[in-house]
Amino acid sequence: MLTQCILYRQLTNDSTYIDMESSLRDWLLGCNPWGVCMIVELPGAKCYPTQPHSFMISEGIGNTTGGLVDGPVYQGIFNSLRGVNMEGGINYMRYQPNVMVYHDSTNDYSTNEPTMDGTACLIFPFAAYEAESRSRK
């Protein structure tokens, strides 16, 4: 949706959806119930996933820097999953809304696994914002 909002604004010069665009971007950057940027180790973010579900973490060889994690899932879905546990993770218990959950844990593949498609889709918005910033100078 973020990409569609940006493209609509750029192609039509119509700012009808600018609030939606801003909200979608800001949610990914940490304006969400958990206060967590959903991009691993994003520079400038105060709080971001530090323990994504990745072999790089479990093998101690690095992190998935720049990866967009899955994000929250419905509590019912999370509770039905097998092999998920919160050992050694940050569970954000006091911030969990009643119907959704998010955890920063290498053992939570449902909410904290970096996704290739999501990460790839972030390239366009960030490139678009960079281009817009440069054109204003």
Features from the language model and the residues they span:
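Aromatic (Trp/Tyr) and acidic
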Residues: M1-K137
